[in-house]
Amino acid sequence: MLHPRARTMLLLSLPAVAIGIASSLILIVVMKIASVLQNLLWLRLPGTLGIAQDSPFWIIAILTLTGIAVGLVIRFSQGHAGPDPACEPLIGAPVPPSALPGLIVALILGLAGGVSLGPEHPIMTVNIALAVAIGARLLPRVNRMEWTILASAGTIGALFGTPVAAALIFSQTLNGSSEVPLWDRLFAPLMAAAAGALTTGLFFHPHFSLPIAHYGQMEMTDILSGAIVAAIAIAAGMVAVWCLPRLHAMMHQIKNPVLMLGVGGFILGILGVIAGPVSLFKGLDEMQQMVANQAFSTSDYFLLAVIKLAALVVAAASGFRGGRIFPAVFVGVALGLMLHEHVPAVPAAITVSCAILGIVLVVTRDGWLSLFMAAVVVPNTTLLPLLCIVMLPAWLLLAGKPMMMVNRPKQQPPHDNV
């Protein structure tokens, strides 16, 4: 016979697995539709019209039209496509299900149109809202927080293709003063994360790792170098943190969301013309292209890092629906490659991983997630001790500093005031 603790853990196992699978399937469907639309907008359509897909005219036109289209969705859809991601954490309160269709459409348009945001925040919002709404009907005795945790864990597993990230994140959020052991509380979320990761793996494998030269033995000087790189990345990220609320307030002086997002899309188009197509989209595939292109110089990497960070701030401030983690990873990779080109004596594995750690820490203020992203992009077990040590001064630098989030005015409703 099972111990009562084991029976308690098994109680939510089936719902956890179902939520993990559903979270992954929603992500897969959204990404597939966005991929088809992206192929149409950036390959087939310009080819049919005889226009180069990387021409300045096409980049500006598509991003401007994308902004207008997203603005129309936010203006006229029920629930106004959910909350403004610039004002929300990654894992937030559930939104009304009526806002989800508009949110999904706005996300797909942004992903396909080349906006420099990832899918993580809207997908998380959709999955949490559905899990809470359906779970409350089927098992009303389970509280909303449990459904929120299961949905967020399943989504994290699906996004990163592994339950490890969920285990790291929830090991700190669920580690309260309760007498219930931590792993008892982690059991159901890890089931959801594992189900989400395995389901994603059946259809595609998220490819984060980069072909960067292997890092050998750690030396004391490497710790200092890594800490300096992380500090540089944090400094760059804090510039974006300073700019985001100010640009957000400036953009939201335009009361019409169609015009506001149209202007935002136009600015993104200008930035895309300056840095080229590799600076567009969420950044994961593009960072692979960036590493593979041996022709990039130090100034090219610097330009890509600056433009991508600026595009991230503009997209978030304009009200596009998307997450900030994936483009931040791109910024970290570009910054790390730039620093390696500038100081070749410091291995690229150190500069890239520590730059990712620093910039993701600024964006998420989550040490475990920052370590995870640095470790999966530059998969080298020798780097893990160095990253853990570099995390300490990086965390000190950010202690008490503002987050990359806009404080919503008290009089503003939960959704965009349109």
From Swiss-Prot:
This is Putative ion-transport protein YfeO. The keyword Membrane applies. One of its GO terms (cellular component) is plasma membrane. The gene is yfeO. It is a multi-pass membrane protein. InterPro entries: Chloride_channel_YfeO (IPR022969), Cl-channel_core (IPR014743), ClC (IPR001807), ClC-type_chloride_channel (IPR050368). Keywords: Cell membrane, Ion channel, Ion transport, Membrane, Transmembrane, Transmembrane helix, Transport. It is found in: Cell membrane. It comes from the Bacteria. Gene3D superfamilies: Clc chloride channel. Pfam families: Voltage_CLC. Its main location: membrane. It comes from Escherichia coli (strain SMS-3-5 / SECEC). Belongs to the chloride channel (TC 2.A.49) family.
